Curated annotation (Swiss-Prot):
Involved in coproporphyrin-dependent heme b biosynthesis. Catalyzes the decarboxylation of Fe-coproporphyrin III (coproheme) to heme b (protoheme IX), the last step of the pathway. The reaction occurs in a stepwise manner with a three-propionate intermediate. Pfam families: Chlor_dismutase (PF06778). One of its GO terms (biological process) is heme B biosynthetic process. Keywords: Heme, Heme biosynthesis, Iron, Metal-binding, Oxidoreductase. Signal peptide: none annotated. Belongs to the ChdC family. Type 1 subfamily. This is Coproheme decarboxylase. It comes from Bacillus mycoides (strain KBAB4). Disulfide bonds: none annotated. The gene is chdC.
Amino acid sequence: MSEATTTLDGWYCLHDLRSIDWAAWKTLSSDERGQAVSEFLNVVEKWNEVATAKKGSHAMYTVVGQKADIMLMILRPTMEELNEIETELNKTTLAEYLVPAYSYVSVVELSNYLPADEDPYQNPQILARLYPELPKANHICFYPMDKRRQGDDNWYMLPMEERKKMMYSHSKIGRQYAGKVRQVISGSVGFDDFEWGVTLFADDVLQFKKLIYEMRFDEVSARYGEFGTFFVGNILPDEKVEKFLHI
């Protein structure tokens, strides 16, 4: 049996995507819509307080295309907190006009290739990646993915050293986009339908296409990668929520 890779796990992660029932939303009076937006922003302010205390992080984006209208990405220390956030959101008036479109549950993950005598949880660089402050980049791209397990193309039957070598080559491509694309990898084996979630942040949306296209030629993606649905969107600052929902 091939050796399993040891992983480092950080904050739990929820991607919550909703579509807006615009027809129903329009039936409310201007005052009713205003109250619903204010209630929602009060919830968001609680998230901001958590982020300021460095006990979690979140991001809010509008989604381009018809797959969804809004994407929320929430990071918290426990799965229970993610559930509480989702429940609190669902109890708001605005949620009555939000239709669930997609969700993904995972945990921020890094592969541990450090020497056995080094405690990764004492390494500031690793801690910053396991418990990240999500950037306020202009754009987001999220997609789930698996490693293929078919015939000779079975990632999990490869020796550990061969997997390490290929992942190192794969990661070199990503490092070429340092400063252009910020990446958060989250593991989801046993949590959701795919094995990983990949979230990319960039101020230039075209960098998503360039990075993902270049990686497709690397063996890790070309031979072993299987991908789910892609979601891309634009940042939705708190101060623009009211305008976005205005009728």
